[in-house]
Amino acid sequence: MAVMPFSPDQIIRPEILALSAYHVPPACGMIKLDAMENPYPLPPELRDEIAKLAGETPVNRYPDPDAAALKAALREALSIPDGMDIMLGNGSDEIIQIIALACGKPGAVLMSVEPAFVMFRMIATFASMNYVGVPLHPDFSLDAEAMLAAIARYQPAVIFIAYPNNPTGNLFDAVEISRIIDAAPGVVVVDEAYHAFADASFMDKLAHHPNLLLMRTLSKLGMAGLRLGLLAGKPEWLRQLEKLRLPYNVGIVTQRIAEKLLQHRDVLLQQAAAIKLERSSMSRRLAELEGIEVFPTDANFILFRLNQDHKATQVFQELKQRGILVKNLDGAHPLLKNCLRVTVGMPDENAQFLEVLQTLLVKVEAKA
């Protein structure tokens, strides 16, 4: 009997076939200013403690499925309010996916602003939810009236709001976010991935809004390689979401090392303070360059737009050829036309980036 040819296209959902996989560019040997990581290494003595701890960790055993010790450390370090529960994820991405899967009834809508964190849209597709993106104002401020109108029209099951926003870096007006939370018929998740670099939070609002959840990650604070995200909220929400969390999703090495680093949170906060100082200096120096518009930021990155004499894609490629990797956002959304995003690195990395960028801009002007 002849065997019929088999194709995954016959089985896999068409909306998945239409997706492109999330691309992470190779960065070996480059100045890496594209992924919003903390660039500072840990002090040698702390690295030695972690190496010893890793060596003593029983990796042949499954981790604590509840990560009780780590949760206790996080509750204290992040000032989680009394009465609120915590759920941990393998990075924030897993938490976003759990929420979407839990709320993804047939025809349900997941809403966010645009431009926003790309995983909101992608995970809505993964979970068979309809995605609605509401454009920001041209200055990247929140269009609260448009959001409220979209809420009334689409009745979203889930709304994600990043605070500060990625990729724009700005903090939206807190009063307007509260209006959105009050108007939402479903759950509102405030994503505070960049909280370490901002001076605002909705953590103390959790008790005041029955439909509010708050998400954090330790990636930007210096633990990107550990992949650890956190969701805080009322127990009645988290009890349901826990049903979708896969067993042992936070590995034993991640649990042990994260606990150790939280005991030395002062080191991480000092590094965050250094990044904020560099951010101010870098924003100022970028703004001094001819042909660049720099946008306000409360994150560990800076969004800037090149004027019409320069092409963002060309500048991105030339920076890359010179060993500097930033994020090219031109084409990602109409509001991001000719925009690049640069992570705040260490002082010498930032200086090299600025020097090369200035050289490239001058070269283009000379040709004009």
Curated annotation (Swiss-Prot):
Coiled-coil region: none
Stored Pfam families: Aminotran_1_2 (PF00155)
Reactions catalysed according to its record: L-histidinol phosphate + 2-oxoglutarate = 3-(imidazol-4-yl)-2-oxopropyl phosphate + L-glutamate
GO terms of molecular function: histidinol-phosphate transaminase activity; pyridoxal phosphate binding
Named cofactor requirement(s): pyridoxal 5'-phosphate
Keyword Hydrolase listed: no
Keywords: Amino-acid biosynthesis, Aminotransferase, Histidine biosynthesis, Pyridoxal phosphate, Transferase
Membrane-spanning parts: none
EC number(s) reported in the record: 2.6.1.9
InterPro entries: Aminotransferase_I/II_large, HisP_aminotrans, PyrdxlP-dep_Trfase, PyrdxlP-dep_Trfase_major, PyrdxlP-dep_Trfase_small
Residues annotated with N6-(pyridoxal phosphate)lysine modification: K220
Subunit structure: Homodimer.
Protein family membership: Belongs to the class-II pyridoxal-phosphate-dependent aminotransferase family. Histidinol-phosphate aminotransferase subfamily.
UniProt name for this protein: Histidinol-phosphate aminotransferase 1
Name of the gene this protein is made from: hisC1
